[in-house]
Structures are given as C-alpha cells and as structure tokens.
Amino acid sequence: MAASRPLSRFWEWGKNIVCVGRNYADHVREMRSAVLSEPVLFLKPSTAYAPEGSPILMPAYTRNLHHELELGVVMGKRCRAVPEAAAMDYVGGYALCLDMTARDVQDECKKKGLPWTLAKSFTASCPVSAFVPKEKIPDPHKLKLWLKVNGELRQEGETSSMIFSIPYIISYVSKIITLEEGDIILTGTPKGVGPVKENDEIEAGIHGLVSMTFKVEKPEY
C-alpha cells in the first residue's frame, strides 16, 4: 500500500486540508482583523487540490478572487492529540500552497456570521507545488516565501513571522481533528494578498527550494 501511495503525491490521496487563518500579524492588520489567542481553522475538501500543470478555476459567483500564499505542512503519519514537543516527529514534508479566496463572498459570510465554505472551499482553490521532503528543510520557520502575478511581486514574507508556530499548530489541530498520513496543514499567509482575474499568471516560490506557476481560468460549466 505504501508503494502505491507515495507521500510525494499527497494531493492524489490525502484526505484533509486544514487551513489556519490570521497567523501573520501583517496580514491580520491588512485585513483589519483581530489577533486571536488561538488559531482560526477551516477546511477545504480534497477536490480543492490543483497540482502544478492544472489551472486555478475562478468560481462564477465571485468578482474578487484573491491569492493567499502559504507554507503547507504534509503529515507523514497519523497523529491524535500530540504534545507540542513531539509534533515535528509527525511531519513528512512540505509544499508551497495557495489558499484561493473569493474575497467578496467571504466578506458577505463574515457579515452574516456564516462559515467560509463558499469563499474558500471551491474546486481548485488549493494549488500546490511539488513535495519538499522534511530533510530539505531543517527549520521551517526560516523560509522566505514570494508570489508574483504577471511578473509583479505581490507577496513576500518570512515564516519566522508566524504568530503560532508549526509545532503548536500541529498539536492544536490534532486535539480537534485526527490527522492522517498525507493530510496537509496550510499555516497562514503573509501580507500582500490581492485580486487575480481570468488569464492571469501566478508564480510563487520558497526561496532556494521550490517554485510553481499557475494560470487562472473560468470553468466551462
């Protein structure tokens, strides 16, 4: 079974996409939100995955689709209620991810006190890079992330600026959701989120490790 489910292709069989909101203070400020004492969590379905080579699909119901650049932590084995001190033992690797967000829809959901599902969980709302093995990143809190739209730099941030550390997040999430091998946790976005439109090209990367490119398209249905 392990041979038929390589962790390097987690997006083909991983079950859970767990996302953390408001984890960079500069992004919290740009969104005019409050810094909370615990992580904000939401989920995406596995059909949200868009590996490089496939398009980002812009839902017909949004006029304001935003990019959010995030480090994804890929779980290497099952974990439930793990202590923070042991949390990194359960990590299998990493990937660069985008949390594509229908911002206008999210704003309406916030006003009405509704979940963010329509804004965050649509098909192809989670573009992902190639898998980066854990061994290539000794300290995930010392990474530089960047994103460009049509060649223009939009986002640039350092994972050292996270409010909640990766071990804390894993421990916190695992006390609520049993995490399985192949699951991924998106750890939040730095400042600079902004709109994209049909035919835009998004390039993003982790300095010195991995990069990815996606085109924005409208679905045919």
UniProtKB/Swiss-Prot annotation:
One of its GO terms (biological process) is pyruvate metabolic process. Oxalate binds at R22, K120, T189. Changing H27A: Loss of acetylpyruvate hydrolase activity, while moderate decrease in oxaloacetate decarboxylase activity. GO terms for cellular component: cytosol; mitochondrial matrix; mitochondrion; nucleoplasm. Its EC number is 5.3.2.2, 3.7.1.5, 4.1.1.112. PANTHER family: ACYLPYRUVASE, ACYLPYRUVASE FAHD1, MITOCHONDRIAL. Homodimer. This is Oxaloacetate tautomerase FAHD1, mitochondrial. It comes from Homo sapiens.
